[in-house]
């Protein structure tokens, strides 16, 4: 079972791992829960609802369509989303279409990966990073245990 905290009412919901990727709703308030196996698209308008209210840590991939390294990193981001479904919200922000959020967090180069916990920015990685480097930064956020 995967435990997901509802971002709306803060109730902890237990979801069978077999239902990961399927639509799920909070048992208390009936709002949708993020159980997706793919990154979620974030806009300036939806940033606070998706990232700030997330019940799990968030990996936000800031990218642009014209960026070659962003496209090279995309399969890694997709793999991380599948591997950590239910424990991590993976989101993507097109910086050209959503300059307000990119500016708010000082995104000057892409790709930039922003890591959030409890709605607060806690870490960032700039440039195309290997999966191992990304996982090393995610590990303490997901497990609550810092690496030695």
Question: What kind of region is each of these model predictions?
Answer:
Residues 30-38:
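Short Cys/His-rich micro-motifs in 6-15 aa windows
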Residues 40-58:
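A short beta-strand-turn-helix
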Residues 15-25:
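Short linker/helix segments within small regulatory modules
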Residues 6-9, 26-29:
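Short cysteine-rich clusters marking metal-coordination/redox-active sites
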Residues 109, 114-147:
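Non-catalytic, surface beta->alpha helical segment in thiol-disulfide oxidoreductase systems
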Residues 69-84:
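Typically the conserved alpha-helix immediately C-terminal to a functionally engaged Cys/Sec
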């Amino acid at each position: 079972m995967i435990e997901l905290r509802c971002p709306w009412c803060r109730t902890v919901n237990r979801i069978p791992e077999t239902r990961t990727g399927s639509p799920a709703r909070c048992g208390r308030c009936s709002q949708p829960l993020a159980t997706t196996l793919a990154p979620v698209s974030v806009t300036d308008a939806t940033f606070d609802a998706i990232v700030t209210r997330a019940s799990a840590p968030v990996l936000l991939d800031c990218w642009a369509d014209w960026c070659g390294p962003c496209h090279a990193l995309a399969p890694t981001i997709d793999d991380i989303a599948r591997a950590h479904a239910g424990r991590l919200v993976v989101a993507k922000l097109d910086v050209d279409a959503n300059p307000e959020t990119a500016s708010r967090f000082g995104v000057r180069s892409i790709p930039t990966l922003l890591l959030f916990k409890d709605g607060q920015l806690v870490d960032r990685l700039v440039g195309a990073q290997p999966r191992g480097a990304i996982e090393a930064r995610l590990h303490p956020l997901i497990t609550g245990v810092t690496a030695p």
